[in-house]
Amino acid sequence: MKNQKIIAIYGKGGIGKSSTASNVAAACAEAGKKVMIIGCDPKSDSSITLLRGRRIPTILDLLREGVDIKKEDVVFEGYAGVKCVEAGGPEPGIGCAGRGIIVAIQKLKSISGNLLKEQDLIIYDVPGDIVCGGFVAPVRKGFVNEAYVLTSGEYMPLYAANNICKGLSKIGMPLSGVICNSRNVSREEEIVSKFSEEIGSQLMAFIPKRQVVQDCEREGYSVMEKAPESDIAEIYRKLGKAILENEKRVTADSLSDERLRELTK
């Protein structure tokens, strides 16, 4: 049986989840793995840099329009063969995005045959600063078997990461690791490494802040496609390899607010 990795990446809004998820997906696909990325954000932008800036229809939008959805309507092949899917979100002010994800993924499973089972790695790019009832549903439904938290070394992203760890632990979902997407703050790698250690997990990667990431995104590309020789591309390759090989899964502890403030001073 295929040793399939199905991961969710959580973190504070705006911390760089979609950028990290899409570049890791591309890096793993370049290494010969079958990869799918499933965007779960109402903005439906998780796969945009794998598709050269193209936005694709979301499952929930098509369902609302009454379309008889087929696999080719919602699964698109992006850079390096990454399969790209956008679940979409509810209409503004109506419904729960988390529960919408469940509807979308169940629909995807029903129309895609063995496509999901054939993947070596499936990445769920999950929105939100907290693990609410809706957003943990993919975990409870068994869609996901590993969780990663993305943060920087600043107080608010760490506060969100800490809350996410608390929420995951409450539902019995192990944490596989922490990823630091740098904002160039003082002692950042040290802070996030210490945070990871104190919650019982591990720092998977420190991704330095580089202008090339924004430059590539502005043009509609992933770093892996547009700047493959950059130091950031190499970091994404190492992170992808580390995720594929990672076997560590812990029920994460969470820190007190006082300890978080102490860490980030």
Swiss-Prot record:
Keywords: ATP-binding, Iron, Iron-sulfur, Ligase, Metal-binding, Methanogenesis, Nucleotide-binding. Its EC number is 6.3.3.7. CDD domains: NifH. It catalyses: Ni-sirohydrochlorin a,c-diamide + 3 AH2 + ATP + H2O = 15,17(3)-seco-F430-17(3)-acid + 3 A + ADP + phosphate. It comes from the Archaea. One of its GO terms (molecular function) is ligase activity. InterPro entries: NifH/chlL_CS, NifH/frxC, P-loop_NTPase. GO terms for biological process: methanogenesis. Its cofactor is [4Fe-4S] cluster. The keyword Ribosomal protein does not apply. PROSITE patterns: NIFH_FRXC_1 (PS00746), NIFH_FRXC_3 (PS51026). Involved in the biosynthesis of the unique nickel-containing tetrapyrrole coenzyme F430, the prosthetic group of methyl-coenzyme M reductase (MCR), which plays a key role in methanogenesis and anaerobic methane oxidation. Catalyzes both the six-electron reduction of the tetrahydroporphyrin ring system and the gamma-lactamization of the c-acetamide side chain of Ni-sirohydrochlorin a,c-diamide to yield 15,17(3)-seco-F430-17(3)-acid (seco-F430), the last intermediate in the biosynthesis of the coenzyme F430. Homodimer. The Ni-sirohydrochlorin a,c-diamide reductive cyclase complex is composed of a NifH homolog component CfbC and a NifD homolog component CfbD. Belongs to the NifH/BchL/ChlL family. NCBIfam families: F430_CfbC (NF033200). This is Ni-sirohydrochlorin a,c-diamide reductive cyclase complex, component CfbC. The lineage of its organism: Archaea, Methanobacteriati, Methanobacteriota, Stenosarchaea group, Methanomicrobia.
